[in-house]
């Protein structure tokens, strides 16, 4: 399991505030929250891209700066960069080389699954955003890393590809775990058993019904202020119309 203890991150303000949480094996955990709430910073700290101001992150006895930890985690960031000078296949081979249990013999099958067979040997500079996202998902799955962490993994995917990826993640839960940031209600509804809400620097389990999640987010101070503005604007517009 991934264990986070007393994680804090300070920039000019406190972004993450003493977060302690455990992500068990063989489940999909979904993190939701408004923009700027610290979700991306949280995952960046977990995988070691950013150093926390305080706190520790472990998988079993392996610290997140250790090689054994890194071999067990695959991270799909929201603002990923893929090298334009590589083909899709070259990139997959390059990434999977650092994972000792990677399924290299399944690469062709997954390019076909994600409708990228014809693009396999084309340069990544010719790929659309959605195609690049598919390549990242293929790499994550074929890495056989026990933990896949993803920031808005489903952005840029069409509805069919989203459903295929959901089914794929579900099929892998016997030996894989996923921690995903998402605002996509399709994803939240599919994986509604393990939802975490990021708000005011805290990450807490959401125990209500998924239908209550929207109301919970709307109670966030910055969102509430925006809703108040909308209501005032609508009232003003009605008065002008009269």
Language-model segments: which ranges?
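Helix-to-loop junction immediately C-terminal to a conserved catalytic motif
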Residues: 47
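The feature captures the beta-strand-to-loop junction immediately N-terminal to the Walker
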Residues: 32-34
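Catalytic Walker B motif of ABC-type/P-loop ATPase nucleotide-binding domains
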Residues: 148-152
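Conserved ABC ATPase "signature" region
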Residues: 93, 104-119, 141
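Conserved H-loop
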Residues: 184-190
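Conserved ABC transporter NBD signature motif
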Residues: 55-69
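Helix N-cap at the start of a conserved alpha-helix in ABC-type nucleotide-binding domains
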Residues: 159-161
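Conserved beta-strand-loop-alpha-helix hinge in the C-terminal portion
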Residues: 202-227
């Amino acid at each position: 399991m991934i264990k986070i203890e007393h994680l804090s991150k300070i920039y000019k303000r406190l972004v993450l505030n003493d977060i302690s949480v455990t992500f068990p094996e063989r489940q999909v955990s979904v993190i939701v929250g408004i923009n700027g709430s610290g979700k991306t910073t949280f995952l960046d700290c977990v995988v070691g891209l950013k150093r926390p101001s305080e706190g520790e992150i472990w998988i079993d006895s392996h610290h997140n700066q250790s090689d054994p930890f890194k071999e067990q985690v695959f991270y799909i960031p929201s603002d990923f960069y893929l090298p334009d000078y590589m083909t899709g296949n070259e990139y997959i081979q390059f990434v999977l080389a650092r994972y000792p249990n990677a399924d290299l013999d399944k690469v062709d099958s997954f390019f076909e699954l994600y409708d990228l067979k014809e693009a396999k040997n084309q340069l990544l500079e010719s790929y659309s955003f959605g195609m690049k996202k598919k390549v990242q998902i293929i790499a994550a799955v074929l890495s056989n890393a026990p933990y896949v962490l993803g920031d808005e993994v489903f952005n840029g995917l069409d509805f069919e590809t989203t459903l295929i990826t959901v089914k794929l993640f579900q099929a892998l839960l016997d030996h894989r775990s996923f921690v995903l940031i998402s605002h996509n209600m399709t994803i939240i509804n599919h994986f509604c058993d393990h939802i975490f809400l990021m708000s005011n620097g805290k990450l807490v389990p959401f125990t209500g019904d998924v239908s209550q999640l929207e109301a919970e987010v709307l109670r966030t101070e910055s969102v509430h202020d925006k809703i108040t503005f909308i209501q005032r604007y609508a009232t003003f517009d009605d008065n002008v119309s009269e």
